[in-house]
Amino acid sequence: MTQEQFKELLRSQQGELNAVLMYQRLAKVVKTDKERETFLQLAKEEGRHASVFHAYTKEALKPKKTMAIIMPFLYRLLGKKRLYKLIAKGEYDAAIGYEHLIADFPEVESVKNDEK
């Protein structure tokens, strides 16, 4: 693994960990039980994704709270319809970003497929 690949895997792991916290916080502010369950399920999936990257990096990272603070605020400000579009775009962009890692790190393909 090159130094650049390692840095990219670390960035990806950090992003997935940040998403876990973000989805957990969103689950606390949504209005319906169905939305709450959906966000908790997404948090669980993002945790699995982070563990895939952790298997390669062997680094213990902590989630950063920035998005976990901003997204519930945006939920209240923009409403769920607009916010969900932003979240979906972020997930799709992440999937595209993982494509070039698959050749060297095959487990990343499962993460990429989940993100779409």
Question: How would you name each of these model-derived features?
Answer:
Residues 1-116:
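Non-heme di-metal
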